[in-house]
Amino acid sequence: MQYPLPIARLIDNYMKLPGIGEKTATRLAFYTMDMPEDDVEDFSKSLIQVKENLHSCSICGNITESDPCEICRDANRDRSTIMVVEQPKDVMAFEEMGEYNGLYHVLHGVLSPMDGVGPEEINIKSLITRLQKQDEVKEVILALNSSPEGEATAMYLAKLIKPAGLKVTRLAAGLAVGSDIEYANSITLKRAVQGRTDL
């Protein structure tokens, strides 16, 4: 038996979300159908508002309702440091941490030649232009994931940025507490050694 068309469409739409398979999408569709109408309206409005009201900051590429974004406008931020991240959600994670008070630059991805993602497809050109215009920047922190693509992107960016005389750093990363060295991958071990501190 096939589902009625409205449910089938809703299932198909839920399946467009990352990590949502057919079973989960079906569960969500039926849950949505059982929700109060006001909640469904709020849900649909929030989806539309995200698409209509959010855009990328013209300076850093973070998501924002106003341009430039709140972080770029904040005169109390440390303008000598720019942290380069992959996605807007990474900015949110660092902001929640509350330890970093510099600026950001969001790439909206990483280099991945296998997927057809080169330097032109992510927000690299605007980073280089920004670094050329903003004399107060002294350090660029590459806060990219430890995936092969993240590592390749970090190396590529370092080669572009270092000739300008800026300090380029990478987040220290290493072994998780309680993990066995023999099961750690080479990138984790390399970063653990490079990020070591004196005792």
From Swiss-Prot:
InterPro entries with a match to the protein in the record: DNA_Rcmb_RecR, Rcmb_RecR, Rcmb_RecR_Znf, TOPRIM_dom, TOPRIM_RecR
Pfam families with a match to the protein in the record: RecR_C (PF21175), RecR_HhH (PF21176), RecR_ZnF (PF02132), Toprim_4 (PF13662)
Coiled-coil residue windows: none
Annotated CDD domains: TOPRIM_recR
This protein's UniProt keywords: DNA damage, DNA recombination, DNA repair, Metal-binding, Zinc, Zinc-finger
Alphabetical GO biological process terms: DNA recombination; DNA repair
GO molecular function, one term: zinc ion binding
Toprim domain sequence ranges: 80-176
UniProt cross-references to Gene3D superfamilies, sorted A to Z: 3.30.60.80, 3.40.1360.10, 6.10.250.240, RecR Domain 1
Start and end residues, zinc fingers (C4-type): 57-72
Listed PROSITE patterns: RECR, TOPRIM
Protein family per UniProt: Belongs to the RecR family.
Known function: May play a role in DNA repair. It seems to be involved in an RecBC-independent recombinational process of DNA repair. It may act with RecF and RecO.
NCBIfam families: recR
HAMAP family (alphabetical): RecR
Protein name in the entry: Recombination protein RecR
Gene: recR
